[in-house]
Amino acid sequence: GRWQPWHEGHRWLIDQRLNEGLNVCIAIRDVEKSDSNPFSPAEIKKNLERELHDLIALKKVKVIILPDIESINYGRGVGYDIIEHFPPEKVKKISATEIRKKIFKK
């Protein structure tokens, strides 16, 4: 993901997996900075590690940076399951675009 910026919706989704007793690997796409990506992957990783330091120390969460590769893949259903979560209304309403606007108005 882009994680631009980290917000309560991200935390909610991660908590869903942790509550199922599963560990979480957060993959940050290595994208160039832009208006919609105002933070570098290194800045995002540092922020996530600060926000999740307790879970990282317990080895429940790992944060990595991956190359930004876009491709079309066939046979996507092979080897993994798609699990859908339905966030509560307060989480569903979160807009990273609006959060970025507020951050950069300061």
Describe each PLM feature range.
Residues 1-106:
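Nucleotidyltransferase catalytic core that binds NTPs
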